[in-house]
Amino acid sequence: MFERNQKTIFVLDHTRYFSIASEEYISMDFLKGKPSADGGATGAAGNATGSGGSQFSKSLWTCACESSIEYCRVVWDLFPGKKHVRFIVSDTAAHIVNTWRPSTQNMAHVMNAMLIVGVPSRNVPTSSDYSVIHGLRAAIEALAEPTDEQLAAMADFGTDELPRIPNKGRVICITSARDNTSMKSLEDIFNTVLVQQNTLAAPPSKKGLVIDHCHLVILNIVPLGVESLVTNRSLLKISPLLDVEIHTVSAPDISYKLTHLILNHYDLASTTVTNIPMKEEQNANSSANYDVEILHSRRAHSITCGPDFSLPTSIKQGATYETVTLKWCTPRGCGSADLQPCLGQFLVTPVDVTSRPSSCLINFLLNGRSVLLEMPRKTGSKATSHMLSARGGEIFVHSLCITRSCMDEAPSITDGPGGRVSDYRTAELGQLIKMSRVVPLKVKDPSAPPLTRRLPRYFPLTTSSSILFHLQRHISWLPHFLHLLVKEDMDKQDEVRCQQHIHELYKSASRGDVLPFTHTNGARLKLSKAKDQYRLLYRELEQLIQLNATTMHHKNLLESLQSLRAAYGDAPLKSEPGASLLRTYTESPLSPERLEPISSVGASGSSSSNSLLKASKRRMSSCGQRSLLDIISSAERSQSNKRLDFSGRLCTPLGQVAKLYPDFGTKDKDTVTTGASITPNVKEESVRS
């Protein structure tokens, strides 16, 4: 409740130095040819000044007052009655401008008090009595004073429980120091006074509240174009009670600096509404697009932006902070039927309240109109992310729901990331959940199987991704067969039944019966031949039995199925018991003939495919007994045997290095040897190479 930004105190340096000009000159033009009461004196003056123009510059004091008052205006607009700002003017003494009372926490009171204070006089002699230290001492005393909220919290506790009330604050001191040594002196004095104040507030005296923590921000102001010897410094912890940061800024840029600071002090965000159509002030028949910058809570952007959206940001000229750029959209009436589903609403205040575009936008919203703001996505399209509207004389920004709203219907399970999937096994999943319920027992049963064995090991989510579970709707005995396969306590009778069903599948495959598929749009059902369908069926059935092979009966079924696959040409024989089972099938008078492997269309294609299949089987059987290094080495040896080796390596004895071009460079041999004697050597070398 009592955060550090609840109390903010501005300490303004009112010494003689702040009476000098900021060196930022503003041009001023007079209207020409207008008659005045003094017989045209104004017109003459206008002609005189109109040719050359006139300029003036604000003082350092004016720049400090304007920017600090704008700071408190933003705070009071966005947090009315919740956040408090005080002003203290320091020269020969500390002058209190306002208090924590709500009656003095308004713009009218502060501006009237600043008008009475006035600009520092240049005629005042330089004296050590003029110092900003008086204001810093008064600021620490003001932090120890309770606000109305703290007084209400203190009323709920006894007198012995006053230290339980949190008391934190921030002091923003606008001054001008010569160098870092002077700035260090200010920090030490402030820290010393802070410790002394907490000593006075501690029992038994209890003069005010104990200050838990203070954040001191020192703004060192210099005229435009003047270099300062004070260096900038980020937030530094001086003591457990005090954090200090220092900023050196020119007088014309102090407003941008305070706007940047207020974003972090109150967790605010800046939004620039672009492409606002407005009539030209000088030409009412034409219009131009303007931009208006507004401030609001940072949550207005954070709760809207998702992973598929990005906030377009930019940096305003002269500023150092980022602003989110949103585009003006078609205005709508602020009726109940036009309100969009929103995630939150937050108060809004313009940065430059006196500019013409800001006043036009404010009046437009206060007249009962609403404005939609567009935010571009990463893909390039735009989305309406925010809306500006006014109610009760206050302007709000609404964060619209750009994703699926909570008021919409729940998304259909068929609208998954892979497209429309309509064959989910929803009913089977519900039965599986009921069968997999776990109930705690008072006494642990040591003979009970572990939980991992009882969990399902194979469950296709869709019907089209499975052959077994797709056919159970069309083959009457298949559901009971699948139920027997996953039983934990399979007995001999269940094994015999499963053997009969497997034998029935084998007879259907031998007759060439097509499996009763209703559709073949699954990835595994694209093959239309009966043999291929049965081969896929056997593979999935073997996978299901392997995952549930917890008893000897399951293992017997697995061996018999592997023997069937071997007879079908899909897998080699695994063991001797499987071969015996295969012989019992084939030697029976009712058993079908042994199925041949799949062949291509045409006589020539069948012979080539059979040879390739046999060769691949031989390679796979041989690869199972060799390592990967042996396979690669044999492949390299087979390639190297196709070409002759280098002649130098063949002629050189083992263990020695072959010399390349041994006759190269011997001039005597080249001159003595005739061309006839060289020719056989060349031929011999060419033959060797």
UniProtKB/Swiss-Prot annotation:
Keywords: Cell cycle, Cell division, Coiled coil, Cytoplasm, Developmental protein, Differentiation, Meiosis, Mitosis, Nucleus, Phosphoprotein, Spermatogenesis. Residues 521-550 form a coiled coil. Residues 592-619, 665-689 are annotated as: Disordered. Residues 599-614 have a biased composition (Low complexity). InterPro entries: Cell_cycle_regulator_Mat89Bb. Disruption phenotype: Results in almost complete steril males. Mature sperm formed in small amounts in testes are immotile or weakly motile; seminal vesicles are largely empty. Primary spermatocytes appeared normal (Cysts of 16 cells); however, spermatids show irregularities in nuclear size and number. Spermatocytes I exhibit failure of nucleus-centrosome coupling that normally occur upon meiotic phase entry; those that progress through meiotic divisions exhibit defects in spindle assembly and chromosome segregation. Phosphorylated. It is found in: Nucleus; Cytoplasm; Cytoplasm, Perinuclear region. A motif (Nuclear localization signal (NLS)) lies at residues 613-619. GO terms for cellular component: cytoplasm; INTAC complex; integrator complex; nucleus; perinuclear region of cytoplasm. Pfam families: Mat89Bb (PF10221). Belongs to the multiprotein complex Integrator, at least composed of IntS1, IntS2, IntS3, IntS4, omd/IntS5, IntS6, defl/IntS7, IntS8, IntS9, IntS10, IntS11, IntS12, asun/IntS13, IntS14 and IntS15. The core complex associates with protein phosphatase 2A subunits mts/PP2A and Pp2A-29B, to form the Integrator-PP2A (INTAC) complex. PANTHER family: INTEGRATOR COMPLEX SUBUNIT 13, SARCOMA ANTIGEN NY-SAR-95-RELATED. Component of the integrator complex, a multiprotein complex that terminates RNA polymerase II (Pol II) transcription in the promoter-proximal region of genes. The integrator complex provides a quality checkpoint during transcription elongation by driving premature transcription termination of transcripts that are unfavorably configured for transcriptional elongation: the complex terminates transcription by (1) catalyzing dephosphorylation of the C-terminal domain (CTD) of Pol II subunit Polr2A/Rbp1 and Spt5, and (2) degrading the exiting nascent RNA transcript via endonuclease activity. Belongs to the Integrator subunit 13 family. This is Protein asunder. It comes from Drosophila melanogaster (Fruit fly).
